[in-house]
């Protein structure tokens, strides 16, 4: 694979107003994508977005570029990323485009593409789009220009799809659920799904103003959800990120339940129901406690590189069906083609109802080892991970852990961050060791 100039691990992302997230660049991107995608036959593209204020500007730019290449755009309005993947499949569109920066602050935005089957675009198609970007923009004949339309019932279609992943013989009646939609794309979807399945729903993070997406709420900050679950004496809480492809949960005692624990619950339930094909895929960041708990159940476990696209690749390579990142991306290939927070949450709720067990009890078979993650921001072109001092300190830490823990350093694929993760048996030791490495990374950056 050649080095890509614009596409990262999750599409194209950046600060609004800075290249590449400018109207000029996105218009050219729409045109280049249109030129490449038009070669495959269909001339319809689905465009969805989250609730960021910049989404209006960027969808207009995308639509203009696509139209110039002869492709028509169908807009969904604010819609979760997995909903756009689903609608792309059901409308047999040539591609789906999501305008979102996922869990990032409102002043960031991004563009990611789905192929006709609802999966991420293959690398060679992304590379072809980048190659087209280098050419001068030309417009098709006036009679061949693309048009724009709006999908009126997009939300209703996706709500019905989500409900269809919950067993028809079960109901959420009797469950009180707090749901935090991060003032993002699930704000008008998730509460309706849960209510229509019978739950009593308290919804927070459902008042987007274009600038409050992910702000002290949602899957990246569950403190507000934890407080509300305890205050309302709710059975469970669910938190989604800004574009709805991640989910975190909170049990009735206010404890956070992360992607590793969610994967454990879904894998165990699949085993109990005789529906588990193969094993489960996690990532290099997945807690060792997940691996040990699955081993006890006889469920094979494999680690992929960090990033939901790599989890998906590993699932396809092994022929398995379920995988997750501890950040809450959960991929269930029997139901979806990409990470879907609402669908993943519904599978955990299925286990709660079917087994008449609390979320807390469902997690009890898995003991999380202390895992400390420190994010170190760096400036400039130099990668701190190439520093001799960082390498030396990391080796010292590994010696101190003496085979009873793990160290992982990696560069973020979406932000100028080095993620330092240390895992072991003793939380105090793990914390000190993580910060020792982080200090070395800071000095090197």
Swiss-Prot record:
Record: active site: 102 (phosphoserine intermediate)
The organism's place on the tree of life at top rank: Bacteria
InterPro entries, alphabetized: A-D-PHexomutase_a/b/a-I, A-D-PHexomutase_a/b/a-I/II/III, A-D-PHexomutase_a/b/a-II, A-D-PHexomutase_a/b/a-III, A-D-PHexomutase_C, A-D-PHexomutase_C_sf, A-D-PHexomutase_CS, Alpha-D-phosphohexomutase_SF
Reactions catalysed according to its record: alpha-D-glucosamine 1-phosphate = D-glucosamine 6-phosphate
GO BP terms: carbohydrate metabolic process; peptidoglycan biosynthetic process; UDP-N-acetylglucosamine biosynthetic process
Top-level EC class: isomerase
SUPFAM superfamilies noted in UniProt: Phosphoglucomutase, C-terminal domain (SSF55957), Phosphoglucomutase, first 3 domains (SSF53738)
Binding, Mg(2+): 102, 241, 243, 245
Gene3D superfamilies: Alpha-D-Glucose-1,6-Bisphosphate, subunit A, domain 3, Alpha-D-phosphohexomutase, C-terminal domain
UniProtKB keywords: Isomerase, Magnesium, Metal-binding, Phosphoprotein
The keyword Hydrolase is annotated on this UniProt entry: no
Cofactor dependence: Mg(2+)
Modified-residue entries (Phosphoserine), positions: 102
A single MF term (Gene Ontology): phosphomannomutase activity
GO cellular component, one term: cytosol
EC number: 5.4.2.10
Processing and modification events after translation: Activated by phosphorylation.
Cofactor note: Binds 1 Mg(2+) ion per subunit.
Similarity remark: Belongs to the phosphohexose mutase family.
Biological role: Catalyzes the conversion of glucosamine-6-phosphate to glucosamine-1-phosphate.
UniProt name for this protein: Phosphoglucosamine mutase
Source species: Serratia proteamaculans (strain 568)
UniProt lineage: Bacteria, Pseudomonadati, Pseudomonadota, Gammaproteobacteria, Enterobacterales
